[in-house]
């Protein structure tokens, strides 16, 4: 699942009235979310620019409440149309230098604070109106048994390839829904190797766990983690003849273990293991933003799929099941309040019935106070 990034700076089209922009984006968003499916492309846009656009297109609603009419009393209160889209604050130029991705995102981005996810049709409309860039596409992937269990893979797997016995290294990005065969192909392309002479190992924690020989299995099913190592083994000797292949390496691997030790030393000398990888508190950074129709271009907080950067949280290979939460702080009080509310019969009954009829959709104060409220104002409640 290749993900291409484009440093496209489009020329903006003639201006469209703010009210028309708001209506078009609302309608396009509702239609796009209703038909979202696996493989659809979504685009990141910086929250800073998005908020300026929101303020611009809803100012007529806000002013109609503040002034009692749609006319502004003071021309200085009129918000100007935003300039070109500028996503550069999302880009990590340093990380891009060592990855196969043309553009790398900062590791610590948070949806709703740093960026917003837009359906392709919405991005294309805004990009056509305002121009700018760079373009940051991401794919919707399936995360469950149902076809509707979709997520946006904002951060594809970042893997470090270690070539044995030469000791070369490379950093790549690949979707966790790609197959082992696709990883094998990409590794051969990176190191310019002959596929029939190469096998790859799950090298999590600098330990050879298993030979990755099931080419149809997805990396997710193979339990491959964010920022882990993949050992790429060339199965020919110095004379170019086969040395017994991967099966032989499993039985007689002393030479490979010595080479692996040297690879560890080489990696520690390079910047790959420390500076260019999120190796402190963010070692496992596999965000998947949940896509639901009950929210406007928002997803739940990206989950840290694998926090093996924290010694107490090594869960690789653990069976699925119930889990606890760590370091919740004061959120326990919020949880207690929610539990009380949802178990109050009158309160619960109210939200099971058609409470939508009591919502005043025309009240701009209630609908545009916060970022979430302004976003919700652009579409009917689903």
Curated annotation (Swiss-Prot):
> Where's the USP domain?
323-382
The record's section on Pfam families has: DUSP, Ubiquitin_UBP8, UCH
Please tell me where this protein is predominantly located.
Answer: membrane
Query: What organism is listed for this UniProt entry?
Result: Oryza sativa subsp. japonica (Rice)
Gene inactivation effect? Abnormal floral organ and pollen development, and leaf bleaching.
Q: Name one GO cellular component term.
A: plasma membrane
Q: Enumerate the subcellular locations listed in this protein's record, separating them with semicolons.
A: Cell membrane
For this entry, the protein name equals Inactive ubiquitin-specific protease 5
Its keywords, alphabetically, are: Cell membrane, Membrane
> Corresponding gene?
UBP5
Q: What is the lineage of its organism?
A: Eukaryota, Viridiplantae, Streptophyta, Embryophyta, Tracheophyta
Please state every residue range assigned to the domain named DUSP.
16-141
Tissue specificity note: Widely expressed with the highest expression in floral organs.
């Amino acid at each position: 699942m290749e993900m291409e990034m484009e440093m496209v700076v489009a020329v903006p089209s003639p201006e469209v009235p703010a009210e028309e922009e708001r209506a078009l984006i609302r309608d396009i968003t509702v239609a796009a979310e209703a038909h979202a499916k696996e493989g659809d492309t979504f685009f990141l846009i910086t929250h800073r620019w998005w908020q300026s656009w929101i303020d611009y297109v809803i100012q007529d609603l806000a002013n109609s409440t503040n002034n009692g009419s749609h006319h502004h009393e003071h021309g200085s209160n009129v918000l100007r149309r935003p300039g070109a889209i500028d996503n550069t604050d999302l880009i990590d130029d340093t990380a891009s230098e060592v990855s196969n991705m043309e553009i790398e995102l900062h590791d610590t981005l948070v949806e709703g604070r740093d960026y917003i996810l837009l359906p392709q049709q919405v991005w294309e409309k805004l990009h056509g109106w305002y121009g700018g860039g760079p373009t940051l596409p991401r794919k919707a992937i399936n995360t469950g048994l149902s076809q509707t269990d979709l997520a946006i893979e904002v951060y594809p797997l970042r893997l470090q390839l270690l070539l044995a016995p030469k000791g070369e290294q490379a950093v790549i990005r690949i979707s966790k829904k790609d197959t082992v065969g696709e990883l094998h192909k990409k590794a051969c392309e990176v190191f310019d190797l002959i596929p029939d002479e190469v096998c790859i190992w799950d090298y999590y924690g600098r330990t050879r766990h298993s030979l990755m020989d099931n080419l149809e299995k997805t990396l997710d099913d193979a339990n491959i983690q964010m920022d882990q190592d993949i050992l790429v083994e060339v199965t020919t000797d110095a004379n170019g003849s086969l040395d017994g292949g991967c099966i032989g390496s499993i039985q007689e691997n002393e030479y490979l273990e010595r080479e692996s030790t040297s690879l560890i030393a080489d990696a520690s000398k390079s910047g790959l293991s420390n500076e260019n990888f999120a190796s402190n508190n963010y070692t496992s950074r596999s965000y998947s933003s949940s896509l639901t129709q009950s929210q406007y271009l928002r997803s739940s907080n990206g989950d840290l799929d694998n926090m093996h950067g924290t010694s107490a949280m090594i869960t690789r290979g653990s069976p699925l099941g119930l889990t606890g939460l760590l370091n919740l702080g004061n959120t326990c009080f919020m949880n207690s309040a929610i539990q009380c509310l949802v178990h109050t019969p009158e309160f619960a009954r109210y939200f099971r019935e058609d409470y939508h009829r009591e919502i005043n959709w025309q009240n701009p104060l209630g609908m545009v106070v916060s970022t979430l409220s302004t976003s919700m104002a652009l579409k009917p409640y689903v």
